[in-house]
């Protein structure tokens, strides 16, 4: 390869990445997932469009694995361990039992539609059996879903790859050797994948955390150290026959949930790296496919995709979540719909090609077609389905910017900046009248281009910039304090006519609103009553019905219900109102 060829590769690669970024602005206007647009750019530039011929499956496999490792590391860093209280076991059930059921149901229909053997059909089912972390993390961000749904989908997508990889590799081995039966040794191999991946991921994450916090480096080197360490953990786990995908996700989880030096710098750089990984991966996969090869299989492939989306995935979710009573029917329905397929199935479809199996090109084309249908149908409709099934909750108002305060090595202090508009509740209030969360301080107040010296008598005006020092866990309280009037109205429409304290006694609540206790202990706190009726760990947005009224969890403090909204049937709202 001469210098001219290398320079041409740089030019084409840079133009494709730039084009993907520029056309991504169409995503919000057209309501099409950004990953589909990037995939389309690759297809348009490929053999049937711009004429770029790319058929190197080994390179695609390399790029795909590298990109997924970075995306999973970033996803783990942003996942809060607190969400595990409501979603760990349900997500693991979906990642194992769910993938197995989807594989079998999809595989049997694939064998019938394409006149394949049962083992060949099951291989297709295994290839498309897992949800994709890149697609899930990308499309769920900022949708305002309740914690139980979001955590279940994110943990599932981060942990279901071992099952899909295990099934795919096992079935490829069976086809290559002519084997037709299963044996118990395969179960041991699956346990090995999960066990080694978990051990190396958690242990390696802890070691990497100690390195970051104990070694003095230039600030810009810490993100690079984290990425290099994450990739080393990914590769080492794969080398000893564990799940590298699970390991790198757990590594990120450890780093993201412990005090770590240069936290914001690491997250900021990884955000950009994760975007670059997604763009590069979907561009390569778009270049790899030959669009005219998809046309002959379009009708049966569409039938298989719809079967998986409308039948196999919903059945696997219903069975996988059967033991978990906290999930409402609408939450199960949404989780069933958001079985997003992305890069993982396409990368798994490269395995048969590299193994030289018969019909390997068919497996690849089918996987690509199913991913395309999934992203277009499920990804595009996700916001509408979320509203239809009522799994969204009003988001907490966020600061316009936030920055870390590195006062010591593992400092978790941050500076939050809020801009006060005319609709803010605090306009006209003196600073001493603000009920600031404990441990927070107002550091500065800007009015126009002037820095004021704030005192207790300083009143807030429209357009003021307020700088507050606090911790991440103070954001919900600060958000409520500096919320907008329309946002508060949205809260009241969602949570109900009144909001009560979670420790209010049922007897007092019943007496105030004329409700019947029917043998319920009048001394029981309202929060405890809702937990009992909910039959599981509560999250914001959970609802129960009692005495013809709707009771909604409005504010959580860790595992404890802090505030509860109550909504009365039309025309029966009591008075006077109560707002606590």
From Swiss-Prot:
Pfam families: CorC_HlyC (PF03471), Na_H_Exchanger (PF00999), TrkA_C (PF02080). The chain crosses the membrane at residues 6-26, 34-54, 57-77, 86-106, 108-128, 162-182, 189-209, 217-237, 240-260, 279-299, 302-322, 334-354, 366-386. InterPro entries: Cation/H_exchanger_TM (IPR006153), FAD-bd_PCMH-like_sf (IPR036318), FAD-bd_PCMH_sub2 (IPR016169), Na+/solute_symporter_sf (IPR038770), NhaP2 (IPR023729), RCK_C (IPR006037), RCK_C_sf (IPR036721), Transptr-assoc_dom (IPR005170). SUPFAM superfamilies: FAD-binding/transporter-associated domain-like (SSF56176), TrkA C-terminal domain-like (SSF116726). Keywords: Antiport, Cell inner membrane, Cell membrane, Ion transport, Membrane, Potassium, Potassium transport, Transmembrane, Transmembrane helix, Transport. Its main location: membrane. SMART domains: CorC_HlyC (SM01091). GO terms for cellular component: plasma membrane. One of its GO terms (biological process) is cell volume homeostasis. It is found in: Cell inner membrane. Residues 402-484 form the RCK C-terminal domain. It catalyses: K(+)(in) + H(+)(out) = K(+)(out) + H(+)(in). It comes from the Bacteria. It is a multi-pass membrane protein. Belongs to the monovalent cation:proton antiporter 1 (CPA1) transporter (TC 2.A.36) family. NhaP2 subfamily. K(+)/H(+) antiporter that extrudes potassium in exchange for external protons and maintains the internal concentration of potassium under toxic levels. This is K(+)/H(+) antiporter NhaP2. It comes from Pseudomonas savastanoi pv. phaseolicola (strain 1448A / Race 6) (Pseudomonas syringae pv. phaseolicola (strain 1448A / Race 6)).
């Amino acid at each position: 390869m001469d210098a001219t060829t290398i320079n041409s590769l740089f030019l084409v690669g840079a133009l494709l990445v730039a084009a993907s970024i520029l056309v991504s602005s169409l995503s919000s206007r057209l309501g099409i997932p950004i990953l589909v647009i990037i995939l389309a750019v690759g297809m348009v530039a490929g053999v049937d469009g711009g004429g770029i011929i790319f058929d190197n499956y080994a390179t695609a496999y390399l790029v795909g694995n590298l990109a997924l490792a970075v995306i999973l590391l970033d996803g783990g860093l942003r996942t809060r361990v607190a969400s595990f209280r409501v979603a760990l076991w349900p997500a693991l059930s979906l990642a194992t039992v769910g993938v197995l059921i989807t594989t079998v149901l999809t595989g049997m229909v694939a064998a019938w539609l394409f006149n394949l053997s049962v083992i060949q059909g099951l291989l297709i089912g295994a290839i498309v059996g897992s949800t994709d972390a890149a697609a899930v993390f990308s499309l769920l961000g900022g949708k305002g879903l309740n914690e139980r749904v979001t955590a279940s989908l994110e943990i599932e997508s981060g942990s279901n790859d071992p099952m899909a990889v295990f099934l795919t590799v096992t079935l490829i081995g069976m086809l290559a050797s002519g084997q037709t039966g299963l044996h118990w040794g395969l179960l041991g191999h699956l346990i090995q994948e999960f066990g080694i991946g978990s051990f190396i991921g958690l242990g390696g994450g802890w070691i990497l955390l100690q390195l970051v916090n104990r070694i003095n480096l230039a600030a810009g080197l810490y993100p690079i150290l984290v990425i290099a360490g994450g990739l080393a953990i990914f590769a080492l786990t794969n080398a000893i026959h564990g799940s590298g995908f699970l390991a790198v996700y757990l590594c990120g989880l450890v780093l993201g949930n412990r005090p770590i030096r240069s936290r914001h710098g690491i997250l900021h750089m990884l955000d950009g790296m994760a975007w670059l990984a997604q763009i590069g991966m979907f561009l390569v996969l778009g270049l790899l496919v030959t669009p005219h090869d998809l046309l002959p299989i379009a009708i049966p492939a569409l039938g298989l995709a719809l079967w998986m989306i409308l039948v196999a995935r919903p059945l696997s979710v219903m069975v996988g979540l059967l033991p978990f009573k906290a999930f409402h029917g609408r939450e199960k329905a949404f989780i069933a719909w958001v079985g997003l397929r992305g890069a993982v199935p396409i990368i798994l479809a490269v395995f048969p090609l590299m193994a030289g199996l018969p019909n390997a090109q068919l497996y690849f084309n089918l996987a690509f077609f199913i991913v395309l249908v999934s992203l277009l149908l499920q990804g595009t409709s996700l916001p509408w389905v979320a509203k239809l099934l009522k799994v969204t909750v009003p988001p907490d108002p966020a600061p316009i910017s936030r920055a870390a305060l590195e006062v010591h090595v593992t400092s978790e202090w941050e500076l939050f900046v809020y801009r006060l508009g005319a609709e803010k509740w605090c306009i006209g209030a003196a600073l001493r009248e603000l009920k600031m969360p404990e441990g927070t301080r107002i550091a500065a107040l800007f009015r126009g281009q002037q820095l004021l010296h704030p005192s207790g008598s300083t009143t807030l005006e429209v357009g003021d910039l307020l700088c507050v020092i606090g911790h991440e866990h103070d954001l919900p309280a600060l958000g409520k304090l500096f919320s907008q009037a329309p946002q508060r109205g949205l809260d009241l429409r969602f949570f109900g006519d009144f909001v009560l304290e979670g420790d209010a006694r049922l007897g007092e609540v019943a007496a105030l609103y004329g409700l019947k206790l029917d043998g319920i202990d009048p001394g029981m706190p309202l929060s405890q009553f809702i937990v009992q009726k909910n039959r599981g760990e509560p999250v914001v947005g959970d609802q129960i019905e009692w005495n013809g009224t709707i009771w909604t969890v409005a504010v959580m403090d860790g595992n404890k219900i802090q505030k509860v909204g109550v909504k009365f049937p039309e025309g029966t709202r009591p008075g006077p109102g109560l707002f606590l």
